[in-house]
Amino acid sequence: DMVKGYDAVADGSADPSTLGITAVDDQTLQIDLTYDCPYFEEIMAFPATFPVRQDMVESSDNWTFDPSTYIGNGPYKMTEWSHNAYISMEKNENYYDYENLGPDTIKFTLLDDNNAMLKGYNNGELDFIENLPVDEIPTYLASGELEIGDYLGTYYVCFNTEDEVFSDPNIRKAFSLVIDRNYIVENVSQAGEVPADGYVPNGVNDAAGAGSDDFRTVGGSYYSISDEDYEANCEEARQLLADAGYPNGEGFPTITYSTNDAGNHKKIGEALQNMWQTELGVTVNLNNQDWNVFLQNRKDGNFQIARNGWIADYNDPCSFLDMWYTDGGNNDAQYSNPDYDAAIDAAKATSDPEERMKAFHEAEDILIGQDSVLAPIYFYTQPYMLNPDIDGMYYTPLGYFFFGYTSKK
């Protein structure tokens, strides 16, 4: 636990009064940590840590649905919410920088139809959209109207390491090597994603921080993502499978790939199925599930291979790597390796940037290079379209768009 006493309070074995969080006065919150956390300020900027009004939270279970009780401390406040239609906001007169804010009001239209979003943008009803039909992406990329922002996230395949078949790291590696990552980003997802040659994505800070080589650059590639090397990757994979007792896939049991049935996930699953069957000679069934059912099955370990993805909560490799610690809450792979745990412990035991990153690189080497627990497919990007008459919009690689200081020509 990062905050002193959290684990004991969370499991009910200690009184909440023992938690290492104290309101020193009306303006000061003191948080006692169990270790020196270099990214703590970034965590405090994460939405889950934002302050809320206690009286409003306790007034109703539906307090977030009513503009009169949905009270925050940001630059804009909600004035109207027509559910499944739009949310209207206006400048918050109590905001510390009120005088410098941009538009008096901002209206967010709620749509789940990508075609409707694009139509609304093209006819001038919408100034900004972050989704459009997949088959339209190449056209708008070519025209320069579609922007592609960096996004600190990775889409990957997760192996159940406790499954009888995928308990062998060499079999996991074989299944990873035959994934044609370039084909998937160019012909299936088509949103400017970057083929992944490791787990921690581009843009995550290394020891030297922002403006220097990032964690991925320093860590290098775990396999080649070059088109020219794809056949060599497949040859290596077939040899690994043969060494495991399955030459050309002979005798390999039928396996199941699990995914949810929304968006491109099913199409990516079909592409993976074809690659594994064609290159390894194995039989793969697809199990497309409702989102909530899929999440629960993956969490419970009721799968062999499953699609997965992770978006950073803060810009530090810890956001990606500590989740695979033995018995971690997000450790869907059911993975456990004492050497990996020791590397994570070492990273958390020091505040020295070089030592921290050395330990995190060692952890990724074990996770991907040695144990092949995951098969990274691509690094996320964030496509969006913005009215060229809008100035001052700010986007962060953590996936947040800020409109509070915008202006329209």
PLM feature segments, named:
Residues 27-29, 117, 122-131, 275, ...:
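Alpha-to-beta junction loops
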Residues 93-138:
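Ligand-site clamp/hinge motif
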Residues 3-18, 27, 33-101, 105, ...:
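Gly/Pro-rich hinge or "lid" segments in bacterial periplasmic/extracellular proteins
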Residues 26-30, 74-75, 103-105, 123, ...:
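Alpha-helical secondary-structure segments
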Residues 49, 179-211, 263-273, 296-409:
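Detector for C-terminal structural segments
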Residues 131-142, 312-317:
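A ligand-binding cleft/hinge motif common to bilobed small-molecule-binding domains
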Residues 195-243, 262-266:
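Structural transition elements
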Residues 83, 227-234, 240-312, 353, ...:
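Ligand/substrate-recognition segments at binding pockets and active sites
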